[in-house]
Amino acid sequence: MACGATLKRTLDFDPLLSPASPKRRRCAPLSAPTSAAATPSSAAAATAASFSAAAASPQKYLRMEPSPFGDVSSRLTTEQILYNIKQEYKRMQKRRHLETSFQQTDPCCTSDAQPHAFLLSGPASPGTPSGTSSPLKKEQPLFTLRQVGMICERLLKEREEKVREEYEEILNTKLAEQYDAFVKFTHDQIMRRYGEQPASYVS
């Protein structure tokens, strides 16, 4: 009983029997904040400053630059096309004797090649018979459709390989620049956070 009497609250602190309001009184604002109360605000300010610096640093290192692929030549010039055609024509002249010998042995190939040559050379004029056509019409075409297709295929393949090499070179350069910027940004963040602290074996 004695222990119970000493532990029991007095009537002044009982919310049901006290004449004052049972609601708790709000904390009154202090005129001058203490050092303990100022610690969370300073920590929050430091955290916000670190986040803002972290958000601004990538923009500083990774600036928006124009695309490097705009400088790549997108079209072949007339001189390049003419040079490539001449080179391909020289290659095909070396193989022409093989094709002629094959056409002489196989008559079906000569009959297939005649329509292609006719399409390239064009029909004869309606006023002149086929036997007495002009000297220009009697000339054989330089290339058949099959040869033109081979030339175009080779030119496209060479152009594709060149564009692929340029693309790989530019891509590797940009990846190296981004990696260097990332390493520098990470180093700056580490030095900003742990640079002022003394080095220890624990860290």
UniProtKB/Swiss-Prot annotation:
Motif (Nuclear localization signal): 22-27
PTM comment text: Polyubiquitinated. Polyubiquitination is dependent of UBR5 that extends pre-ubiquitinated AKIRIN2.
Keywords in alphabetical order: Adaptive immunity, Cytoplasm, Developmental protein, Immunity, Innate immunity, Membrane, Nucleus, Phosphoprotein, Protein transport, Repressor, Transcription, Transcription regulation, Transport, Ubl conjugation
GO molecular function, one term: transcription coregulator activity
Coiled-coil boundaries: none
Gene Ontology BP terms: adaptive immune response; cerebral cortex development; defense response to bacterium; innate immune response; nuclear protein quality control by the ubiquitin-proteasome system; positive regulation of adaptive immune response; positive regulation of innate immune response; positive regulation of interleukin-6 production
GO CC annotations on file: chromatin; cytoplasm; membrane; nucleus; transcription repressor complex
Chief location: nucleus
Region Disordered, annotated ranges: 115-137
Subcellular location: Nucleus; Cytoplasm; Membrane
Motif extent (SYVS motif): 200-203
Classification via InterPro entries: Akirin
Biased composition (Low complexity): 119-135
Positions of post-translational Phosphoserine modification: 18, 21, 57
Positions of transmembrane segments: none
Family indicated by similarity: Belongs to the akirin family.
Role this protein plays: Molecular adapter that acts as a bridge between a variety of multiprotein complexes, and which is involved in embryonic development, immunity, myogenesis and brain development. Plays a key role in nuclear protein degradation by promoting import of proteasomes into the nucleus: directly binds to fully assembled 20S proteasomes at one end and to nuclear import receptor IPO9 at the other end, bridging them together and mediating the import of pre-assembled proteasome complexes through the nuclear pore.
Assembly with partners or alone: Homodimer. Interacts with IPO9; the interaction is direct. Associates with 20S and 26S proteasomes. Interacts with SMARCD1; promoting SWI/SNF complex recruitment. Interacts with NFKBIZ. Interacts with YWHAB.
Name of the molecule in the record: Akirin-2
